[in-house]
Regions:
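A short beta-strand-to-loop transition that corresponds to the Sensor-1 phosphate-sensing loop
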Residues: 51, 126-127, 198-203
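Phosphate-binding/switch region of NTP-binding enzymes
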Residues: 187-275
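Substrate-engagement module of ASCE P-loop NTPases
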Residues: 147-203, 225-238
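Glycine-rich, phosphate-binding/catalytic loops in enzymes
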Residues: 64-65, 139-143, 214-216
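Short, solvent-exposed beta-strand-terminating loops
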Residues: 123-151
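Switch/connector loops and helix/strand junctions flanking conserved nucleotide-binding motifs
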Residues: 55-58, 130-135, 140, 205-212, ...
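C-terminal regions of RecA-like/P-loop NTPase motor modules
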Residues: 1-2, 9-13, 22, 248-303
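Conserved P-loop
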Residues: 2, 6-118, 122, 130, ...
């Protein structure tokens, strides 16, 4: 357990941007590089690219408008375990080292535009949808192994064995584990002590209803929600639904929620800018940093 006084504590951004392809999520997230620290220097930004190089084009736009991209470092991974390793490095203030062409860590520290060891003020995780998909696929492979054991035990051969193994699906306990992994990720992000922006794809929101035959069916509500780890929206402070206006083609953002009170829920931002939230950073002057440790695993052990 940990306690603190309710005054003079720094506020960090924890923002989720979700939407369809070409809705401007990555471009908006990379505006973290435009932010200024309380000492006037530009943010150092760590970018985790799980979308297969989608960040690269947006970084070129930053260079075109004069941003020193030496203050940005990009990590390419689709592994939740590797992402957790990066977050642990930030949380522990470990040194970041360059990687060689084979993906092996070297002994050369990563440096920023000032020639100092790189340590991020913010992190952009571009593609939480991918991390959920790879985690889900990993659990599906585990389910296949379970079914292989069952097939061996039942003495199945030929087509029956094939169907038993390849027809494996996630079980209830797998979904519980997947949801736990998502919650653990968000709590890890809130515990690293820097500003966080996440992106996710969108999907149709559905509800379960009875059809005329008395069967449960999924029916779309017409709303778009994030396609990522379940419960992700509860822990973040700000959520923007990104979309492209069908008539004008302009990039817009609907404010789903904003605990920082920079904008109100329901506001529609045309040509949105993340710099609206620079005021949150500016108010941190003379305030103490308070990092709430992620004790989810420890809490489970305690219970």
């Amino acid at each position: 357990m940990k306690t603190r006084a309710a005054n003079k504590i720094q506020t960090k951004l924890v923002t989720l941007l979700y939407g369809a392809t070409f809705s401007g999520k990555t471009t908006l997230g990379l505006q973290l590089a435009d932010f200024k620290r309380n000492d006037g220097k530009p943010f150092r930004v760590a970018v985790v690219d799980a979308e297969g190089g989608g960040v690269d084009d947006a970084v070129d736009e930053l260079e075109d408008r004069g941003i020193d991209t030496r203050n940005i470092h990009i990590f390419y991974t689709q592994s939740l375990q590797e992402l957790t390793t990066i977050l642990d490095k930030i949380k522990n203030h470990d040194t970041f080292y360059e990687f060689d062409e084979d993906g092996n860590e070297t002994d050369e520290p990563i440096v920023d535009a000032d020639g100092e060891e790189f340590f991020p003020d913010a992190i952009l995780i571009d593609g939480t949808t991918i991390f959920r998909l790879t985690s889900e696929q990993g659990l599906l492979e585990l389910s296949k192994k379970r079914n292989t054991i069952k097939a061996d035990k039942d003495g199945l051969v030929g087509a029956e064995r094939f169907v038993k193994i390849q027809g494996a699906d996630l079980e209830f306990k797998d979904y519980k584990k997947l949801n736990y992994s998502g919650q653990n990720l968000v709590l890890d992000l809130m515990a690293i002590g820097i500003n966080v922006v996440l992106t996710a794809r969108e999907k149709d929101e559905t509800v379960q209803k009875m059809d005329k035959n008395g069967q449960q069916v999924s029916v779309s509500t017409g709303r778009k929600v994030h396609d990522s780890f379940k419960g992700l929206d509860y822990n973040v402070k700000t959520i923007l639904h990104m979309y492209q206006d069908s008539e004008t083609g302009q990039i817009c953002a609907e404010v789903v929620k904003d605990r920082t009170r920079v904008h109100k829920a329901g506001d529609i931002l045309e040509d949105p800018t993340l710099l609206d939230w620079q005021t949150v950073i500016d108010k941190n002057v003379d305030k103490k940093e308070f990092v709430l440790k992620n004790d989810l695993d420890k809490a489970v052990e305690t219970e």
